[in-house]
């Protein structure tokens, strides 16, 4: 691979899910960072500048929405994929309003996650998504 290795931050409180996602992403050639709550995730976003964030919605200490709100304030925020078992359409709408590029409902196939990750990274590499309107 001649492409620079992309860094993905996985924010997930369920350690089994986090470990599985980390293994799958690492095997696909990504560098993976993990956090088990939103507070630790925010610190890693600030310190490590990941290329993509995968975050759970419901976590102790700080959930996914405060992470999204934090990212919305950053000028160079990475794209975000939200992972959740929540079926609520209002949650999905709010996540999309905050800029989530994909919304994966648990349980999801790892192949689906890998496709979502590849799309998000390709879209980010293609350039800014919010071009000024004429």
Where are these regions (language model features)?
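Charged docking surfaces used in two-component/phosphorelay signaling
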Residues: 19-27
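Acidic catalytic/metal-coordinating carboxylates
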Residues: 36-40, 62-66
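Alpha4 helix (beta4-alpha4-beta5 surface) of REC/receiver domains from two-component response regulators
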Residues: 66, 87-102, 115, 119
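Short amphipathic alpha-helix used as the core "switch/output" element in two-component signaling
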Residues: 43, 65-76
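Active-site beta3 strand of CheY-like receiver
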Residues: 48-54
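Receiver (REC) domain active-site loop signature in two-component systems and cognate sites
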Residues: 59
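Short hydrophobic/Thr-rich beta-strand motif most characteristic of the beta2 strand and flanking loop
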Residues: 29-36, 44
């Amino acid at each position: 691979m001649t492409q620079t290795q992309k860094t993905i931050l996985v924010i997930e409180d369920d350690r089994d899910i986090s470990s599985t996602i980390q293994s799958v992403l690492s095997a696909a050639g990504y560098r993976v960072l993990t956090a088990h709550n939103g507070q630790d995730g925010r610190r890693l976003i600030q310190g490590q500048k990941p290329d993509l964030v995968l975050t759970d919605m419901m976590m102790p200490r700080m959930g996914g929405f405060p992470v999204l709100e934090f990212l919305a304030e950053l000028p160079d925020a990475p794209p975000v994929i939200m992972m959740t078992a929540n079926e609520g359409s209002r949650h999905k709408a709010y996540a999309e309003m905050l800029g989530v590029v994909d919304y994966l409902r648990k349980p999801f196939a790892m192949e689906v996650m890998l496709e979502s990750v590849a799309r998000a990274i390709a879209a980010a590499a293609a350039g800014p998504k919010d071009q000024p309107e004429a």
